[in-house]
């Protein structure tokens, strides 16, 4: 069992890292039998002006790439963590994609030398994100963690599920075209979205699984099981306002795990810790024991 704290962000174009890593955290995790894979991202750091780092520029240069990798490895050694997890979601074009893959190659070699598990987080593969090169990742990484959520997200033009059962199935099968099954870890959501339609305006807010019951009561929503998505679907109207929710709960979570049983996979992950009801871990345990 692994916990992956969001500890590291690229903080300037020299390859510096902002770090929240703590050796004491790793020690406590180890006492509980957990491995710690520190997450390195390209989007959580904003400078004083509210700007993100131009990570593409960092990856484009051998010098700054090496500096970034050195900083990651030094931070890993200092806190004693067990693995490095790369979560880069701002790789915007083919050229940046090639530099990103080269960064993964170089970092993977250093991780292997240091005895660290190396994993990469990815969105579900479609024609518009091929620059992430899953086939190459399947060679380089120990694990490719496919984020089988945000099927509908904050910027979506229509309301819908965060993670329907067909979306999970597609994520597994499409990723499996590029990555060996035993390297694929499927990440499921511990959260759901409440969608609010007022006239032509559509907005949504993400809520933890544990917050669903309060929302159902607050908006007086009724729900029914929807076979198509493998979820309970809830809605209510208040005057001209429509409230909708494709509920992520233990029932929908179990449907996804049951589908995953049909494939030889590397494991299951979830975003994020603290959003889940206690029973989620029992379902995961059953899945792993099968």
Please identify what each model-predicted range represents:
Residues 1-71:
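Glycan-recognition patch characteristic of GH18 chitinases/ENGases
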Residues 31-33, 95-102, 109, 113-116, ...:
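Short acidic, glycine/proline-enriched helix-loop-strand junctions
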Residues 60-78, 126-135, 247-261:
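Short, acidic/polar
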Residues 256-290:
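Acidic/aromatic/glycine-rich contiguous surface patches that form carbohydrate-binding/processing clefts
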């Amino acid at each position: 069992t692994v916990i992956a704290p969001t500890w590291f962000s690229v903080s300037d174009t020299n390859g510096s890292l902002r770090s929240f890593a703590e050796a004491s955290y790793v020690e406590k995790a180890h006492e509980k039998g957990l491995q710690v894979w520190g997450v390195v991202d390209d989007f959580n750091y904003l400078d004083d002006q509210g700007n993100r780092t131009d990570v593409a520029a960092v990856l484009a240069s051998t010098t700054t790439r090496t500096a970034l990798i050195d900083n990651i490895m030094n931070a890993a050694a200092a806190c004693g963590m067990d693995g490095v997890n790369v979560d880069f979601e701002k790789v915007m074009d083919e050229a940046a994609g090639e530099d990103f893959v080269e960064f993964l190659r170089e970092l993977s070699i250093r991780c292997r030398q240091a005895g660290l598990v190396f994993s990469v987080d990815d969105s579900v593969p479609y024609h518009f994100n091929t620059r992430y090169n899953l086939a190459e990742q399947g060679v380089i990484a120990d694990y490719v963690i496919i984020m089988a959520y945000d099927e509908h997200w904050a910027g979506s033009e229509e309301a819908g599920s965060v993670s329907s059962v067909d979306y999970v199935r597609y994520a597994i099968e499409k990723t499996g075209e590029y990555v060996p099954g035993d390297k694929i870890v499927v990440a499921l959501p511990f959260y759901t979205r409440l969608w609010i339609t007022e006239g032509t305006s559509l907005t949504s807010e993400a809520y933890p699984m544990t917050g669903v019951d309060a929302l159902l009561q607050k908006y007086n929503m009724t729900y029914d099981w929807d076979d198509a998505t493998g979820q309970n679907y809830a809605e209510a109207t208040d005057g001209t306002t429509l409230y909708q929710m494709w509920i992520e709960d233990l029932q929908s979570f179990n449907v996804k795990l049951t589908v995953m049983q049909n494939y030889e996979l590397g494991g299951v992950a979830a975003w994020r810790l603290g959003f889940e009801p206690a029973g989620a871990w029992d379902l995961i345990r059953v899945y792993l024991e099968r």
